[in-house]
Amino acid sequence: MRWEFLPCLLLLISNNKIFGFKVPSINFEMLKDEGFEVSIPDEPGIQRVFYMFQIDDTCPALMDYITEAVNGSWVSKQKMSLQNNDKLQISMLVQFNEEIFEKSETRVIINTRLLTTKDSSSRGITFLTGEGECQAYLAPAQQAKRCKAAQTIVSNGRHTCQGELIFEDNFSEAQLNKTTWKHDIRQRMYHVEEELVAFDDAARNCFVKEGELHIVPTIATEVTDGSFKLGDRCTAVESPEQECNIAHGIFYSIKPPVFSAQIHTRNSFSFKFGKIVVRAKLPKGDWLFPYLMLQPVSTYAETHYAKQLRIAYARGNANLRTKQGDDISGNHLYGGGVVWHHGNAVQFLKDKISNSHYGDDFHNYTMIWQRDKITLMVDDEVYGELYDGLPFFNEKCFIIFGVTVGGFLNFDDSLLAKDVKPYKNREPRAALSFWQHRDAWAPTWGRHSAMVIDYVRVYAE
């Protein structure tokens, strides 16, 4: 994350006479195209570097916050043009083993070279106030503000400060970032989940548009003729013979009635303990079910009976009740954990009922995962705290987003009123029955059946 202008007085200072650490010398290079580059060499213990630049004592100052070293250096590139006789003031804060150290240099451009005129450990950059005057960037040592170490553990192993943003995707690029996100590609009908869907990476099922991620379930045109083969694209790890292909001629087997998408960050980002915020609009439509969840890195997105931390979910149905008459439709939000014991799910959930379907509008869904509890929030309102089941989640987890259909855990026959659902879980002809009754559920689907995600952010706790 980078800022270009200094908006307020930061209360950060160092004492580089303590602990035996000395900030390395600042390297400077004029770039051929435009601007300049400054850096310091990486050393074991350096956690982050904060650069500040000011030309000729004028305001505003520029600054750059670097969270990781690249090729052995902590580098900041600036497009700011420098002219002959310009005086460039460089100040930096270096976090080393949870302590903050400062270094400042004032340099002058002479024939496109930068000559050091003053090297200081106390001078600070200034910035423009509302009255048109500049104030010191660095505060007195007694006002120092230190980074408070977080309990969060990140996949790259670096140290974090409480409240620090450690992962973010605003989906601002023209397409899904394939370095960050990978697709789960397999069918889910004839195994543990018994979900009536195949996950694929087709553009119609997962795409970015106008800064939002869309995961869209689409109904198949034909399910009974031919065979279903995913080939080498299939990502199944436990049962590829069942999840990658459906053989023609098996009396109960049909091709998937619905195609959708599921993506994950297992290969790029995972964390243990932290705060995750997802701004999303959930899907609407009978038997649709959204996945906004975390899953342990010791498993794969395709692992059966995997433990899950479900950030939030609400069923797609506009009207759905249990045998006891309880409302479990789309205006009923849930979040919590799911673990498995001998093939049976044990759920630790909290819930909140709204006056409207959670697919009607965007909401901020938040899970704060700490050592001793999990806090669940929607639109900054706490609706539950969990203390049970935490020992089951004692490793880093990655993020999963997806939209599925059905599933014996998501729509449990033992809970639902009789004859509400057009198929029965764990019956050989469940998928065929679901397809044959499509006139009942397909009209409830439409443009609102997509799950739309505005952003996902993860903060250290």
Swiss-Prot record:
Gene3D superfamilies: 2.60.120.200, Beta-1,3-glucan-recognition protein, N-terminal domain. GO terms for biological process: carbohydrate metabolic process; innate immune response; innate immune response-activating signaling pathway; pattern recognition receptor signaling pathway; regulation of innate immune response. The keyword Transcription does not apply. Changing I400M: In strain: Netherlands line N07 and Netherlands line N14. Keywords: Glycoprotein, Immunity, Innate immunity, Secreted, Signal. One of its GO terms (molecular function) is (1->3)-beta-D-glucan binding. Residues 179-461 form the GH16 domain. Changing V75G: In strain: Netherlands line N30. Glycans are attached at N71, N170, N177, N364. Residues 1-20 form the signal peptide. InterPro entries: BGBP_N, BGBP_N_sf, ConA-like_dom_sf, GH16, GH16_GRP_C, Glycosyl_Hydrlase_16. It is found in: Secreted. Involved in the recognition of invading microorganisms. Binds specifically to beta-1,3-glucan and activates the phenoloxidase cascade. Belongs to the insect beta-1,3-glucan binding protein family. This is Gram-negative bacteria-binding protein 2. It comes from Drosophila melanogaster.
